[in-house]
């Protein structure tokens, strides 16, 4: 049965290493017969959470007028969510963290999803990249029924669009 797959790419560079891995993931998901949409955060306007508590204290929609609400709506509708980030100082990039924070208003509706992570870093040691994965897992810990299905590690990706990007992925099938 086809799944609705949402890929969220937080690479600040079109064609950056994590973005290229998103495209490869997308290709495989489409070949498997899934419906796939890729959102590139750099092409969207997503402001940081202001901590106003309108959503958490009063149950009202976030008052900010940007693209975050639309992205969260797509996360709620998806069966599979792929979160992709370059690794900066052993953690996810700011664009991804801002998007995660903006899920606050509706995170209780992001339920029973399959999650994949894509990370690309200059680091050659996968163990050093685990802090980034831990950040994603912190988000998943707040959701109901998430299933972490796999991680694609783009290691040794120091330069933009590194042509010899070595991707190591866990066993994961969509």
Q: Where are these predicted regions, by residue range?
A:
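Conserved small/polar residues in nucleotide/adenosyl-binding loops
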Residues: 163-170
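Cysteine-cluster motifs in flexible loop/terminal segments that predominantly coordinate metals
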Residues: 45-69
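Helix-loop-strand module that forms the ligand-binding subsite of alpha/beta enzymes
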Residues: 63-143
